[in-house]
Regions:
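Active-site helix-to-loop segments that bind/position phosphate- or nucleotide-bearing substrates
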Residues: 1-164, 168
Length: 168
């Protein structure tokens, strides 16, 4: 679709309403006026290489709430606004080289929003931009409760924490 709103039929076809017509959790997270209070995204552009950058800790920050579509769009916009774009001249044009590939930021943020653990109250997805890196934090650990440090990475199978969201 091309907007932030969904038609009623879409809610039914993607199992985002129950048999009584009430939104499921996935439906509520995708609704334009998301009723889920902890569907939030915190974004910060830090001054330096860590969260204590000297005289000024943060150069920019924003807190967004609303549907996952809104959070995704606002998060990508925040990163684009706060990253550097270098460029070099060629014989007949200019090549722009942004710090981060927009498609990669989009994909990482989609994964963070879709696969986060929404049962952890008082938590939110974070985007932190430093002078040398971008980090995206998503609440929740491994779906089976193990620690990733204790696992053989080659044997971890793909598991979707929120399958309805992942299907959409």
């Amino acid at each position: 679709w091309t907007g932030n709103s969904m038609e009623e039929k879409l809610f039914d076809s993607f199992d985002m309403r129950d048999e009584n017509g009430k939104l499921t959790n996935a439906g509520a997270l995708l609704a334009d006026d998301s009723p889920i209070r902890h569907s939030r995204l915190f974004c910060t552009r830090w001054n330096g290489l860590d969260k204590s950058g000297g005289m000024v800790d943060a150069l920019d920050s924003a807190e967004y709430s609303g549907s996952l579509i809104i959070l995704l769009n606002e998060g990508v916009s925040f990163v684009k606004r706060n990253m550097k774009t270098r460029w070099k001249k060629t014989a007949d044009s200019r090549i722009e080289m942004p710090d981060y590939c927009e498609r990669s930021v989009f994909e990482a943020l989609v994964n963070a929003l879709i696969h986060r653990d929404y049962l952890i109250l008082g938590s939110e997805v974070h985007i932190d931009i430093y002078d040398d890196r971008l980090t995206i934090y998503s609440p929740g650990g491994m779906p089976d409760g193990t620690r990733i440090q204790e696992r053989d990475l080659s044997s971890i199978s793909s598991t979707r924490r929120n399958p309805v969201l992942a299907d959409i």
